[in-house]
Design a protein with these regions (language model features):
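ALDH superfamily catalytic-core signature
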Residues: 5, 11, 17-166, 186
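C-terminal lobe/hinge of AMP-binding adenylation domains
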Residues: 165, 172-175
């Protein structure tokens, strides 16, 4: 609230839920601020065949699977050119599998638990829904067990391929790969 109303703040940028975004937008705008609110947004990335594929994959994995995989500025949706999709996907899987999943208090942990048992079940349900709708599950994070935290709320990196428009994995904030043959086909 302080930022939304403070006279020295000239603009606000927000990514997150619609209900919070509407509050931020209306409050900040009422105080004369410029507002950018991406509500229920899903960030997209394009990967072309001339990209530095391995370096791009590592950057995307670092972005996407930090903060227990709940980072609003991640790239959970990738449109990957068919000519490089298999190679790129192999790098994504390599780096996702290498993430250290563990207790949030361990400095070596790269992917901690989700917030609750209910949230874990919700994520597992989203993954199952993607499989039911026909997206190809390349890396399944549903059955992660962390030694010493067997009852923890851990979900590992999950990657879908062949996600199509209209699938839940493509429309909601779930990480998926959508292949295409040319830059104009998917843009």
């Amino acid at each position: 609230e302080l930022l939304l109303k403070h006279p020295d703040i000239r603009g606000i940028s927000y990514v997150g839920s619609t209900s919070v975004g509407l509050h931020i937008y209306s409050t900040a705008a009422a105080h004369g601020k410029r507002v950018q609110a991406l509500c229920e947004a899903k960030n997209h990335g394009l990967v072309l065949r001339d990209a530095a594929l391995e370096r791009s994959a590592l950057g995307i994995i670092n972005s996407t699977f930090g903060c227990a995989g709940m980072r609003c500025m991640a790239l959970p949706a990738l449109c990957v050119e068919e000519a490089c999709a298999d190679e790129f996907l192999s790098y994504l899987v390599k780096y996702a599998k290498a993430r250290k999943i563990g207790c949030a208090y361990d400095p070596a942990t790269e992917l901690g638990p989700v917030v609750s048992a209910e949230h874990k079940q919700s994520v597992i349900n989203w993954i199952s829904k993607g499989v039911e709708e026909g997206a190809k599950l390349i890396l399944d994070g549903r059955n992660v067990v962390v030694p010493g935290f067997e009852n923890g709320h851990f979900v590992g990196p999950t990657i879908f391929d062949h996600v199509k428009p209209g699938m839940t994995t493509g429309d909601c904030e779930i990480f998926g790969i959508q292949r295409w043959r040319s830059p104009t086909e998917n843009i």
